[in-house]
Amino acid sequence: MTQQRPTRTRERKKTWTAFGNLGRKPTDYEVVTHNMNHTMRGTPLELSPTVHANVWLKKNRDEIALKVDSWDLFRDPDRTTYDTYVKMQDDQETYVDNLLLSYTGEGRYDEELSSRSLDLLSAGLTPTRYLGHGLQMLAAYIQQLAPSAYVGNCAVFQTSDALRRVQRVAYRTRQLADAHPARGFGSGDRAVWEKSPDWQPIRKAIEELLVTFEWDKALAGTNFVVKPILDELFLNHLARLLHVEGDELDSLVLRNLHGDAQRHARWTAALGRFAVEQNVNNRTVLRDAIAGWHETGEAVLAAGAGMLASRAPSADAAKIADEVRATLAQLHANAGLGHDA
């Protein structure tokens, strides 16, 4: 009688081994994001280690003070993917298109805007095409050096949002130029951006950020200080003032764009919190980096709040500045970087 050999059960390798021991099936968000940054290795790019791009990545990303063992553990609180982003922003663009059609499709909406509304628009809206391009380049740099696709994707969607903002401002600029050719909408905006005293502290801040190359310092200066101040000034507070002056269209468009800024603040706070949870020393690193931009942020805030208040009788520069500081403090607290943390 021959004995049958016992059948050996072969343990099947899990499909999602790259995720480690998740204990669950990864989400669609994780599948299309996890471990997608191909530069996180000894030599970032498949070129000579001495090639400028490799030296740059090593110096400005891999050798910075902000340290986390695995950036792939970070998660965007909104779990945004390309698919969900496109659908979400398609809805937002449809909303803005309908606003424009509703207000300016027929009648003389722009021609009937008050002089105070036009003053606010020429000072604080149409020159922001240049500001938006600066913010777009800053977000793109944060994305390029991001140590994980989970982080980089957040920044790339922020980059796209900045372009959306530029496009919407440019569209309104053209409409306002047609309605008020003597006002200099469009034709005079570059001079305002480059020469108006109100804008120079802001322009200086953007230009200084554009030559800040260490990733942690660029992130801190952009997303933890300068950008949130600018978003509150020229999206939130400008929207409020235009509403008071009777320009409901531009107020609503800016409030819609402010929704993008709030999403940027969510992922920024989540990233700060994650970095501190992964390495307690990162709290000091980020606080120091933020402190390095404090004086610049205050100059931006004083210039922007003064610009808006000088063109709207209902506004008070000190009150605007205090409200923006409170929003900024809340962002830092949400990131685990507040004074009580």
From Swiss-Prot:
Q: Does the keyword Nucleotidyltransferase apply?
A: no
Q: Enumerate the GO terms in the molecular function aspect.
A: alkene monooxygenase activity
Q: How is its activity regulated?
A: Inhibited by propyne.
InterPro entries linked to this entry = Ferritin-like_SF, MP_mOase_hydro, Phenol_Hydrox, RNR-like
What gene codes for this chain?
xamoE
Q: What induces it?
A: Induced during growth on aliphatic alkenes (such as propylene, ethylene and 1-butylene), epoxides (such as propylene oxide and 1,2-epoxybutane) and chlorinated alkenes and epoxides (such as vinyl chloride, cis- and trans-1,2-dichloroethylene, 1-chloropropylene, 1,3-dichloropropylene, epichlorohydrin, and epifluorohydrin). Repressed during growth on other carbon sources.
Q: Which UniProt keywords apply?
A: Cytoplasm, Monooxygenase, NAD, Oxidoreductase, Plasmid
Keyword Cytoplasm in record: yes
Q: Where in the cell is it found?
A: Cytoplasm
Q: What does this protein do?
A: Component of the alkene monooxygenase multicomponent enzyme system which catalyzes the O2- and NADH-dependent epoxidation of short chain (C2 to C6) alkenes to their corresponding epoxides. Also able to catalyze the oxidation of a number of chlorinated alkenes, including trichloroethylene, cis- and trans-1,2-dichloroethylene, vinyl chloride, 1-chloropropylene, 1,3-dichloropropylene and 2,3-dichloropropylene.
Q: How does it assemble?
A: The alkene monooxygenase multicomponent enzyme system is composed of an electron transfer component and a monooxygenase component interacting with the effector protein XamoD. The electron transfer component is composed of a ferredoxin reductase (XamoF) and a ferredoxin (XamoC), and the monooxygenase component is formed by a heterohexamer (dimer of heterotrimers) of two alpha subunits (XamoA), two beta subunits (XamoE) and two gamma subunits (XamoB).
Q: Which Gene3D superfamilies would you find in this protein's record?
A: Ribonucleotide Reductase, subunit A
At the top level of its lineage, which domain of life is listed? Bacteria
- Reactions catalysed: propene + NADH + O2 + H(+) = 1,2-epoxypropane + NAD(+) + H2O
Q: What class of enzyme is it?
A: oxidoreductase
Name this polypeptide is given: Alkene monooxygenase system, oxygenase component subunit beta
Give the source species. Answer: Xanthobacter autotrophicus (strain ATCC BAA-1158 / Py2)
Q: What is its EC number?
A: 1.14.13.69
**Any one of the GO CC terms:** cytoplasm
Q: Which family does it belong to?
A: Belongs to the TmoE/XamoE family.
Q: A Pfam family name for this chain?
A: Phenol_Hydrox
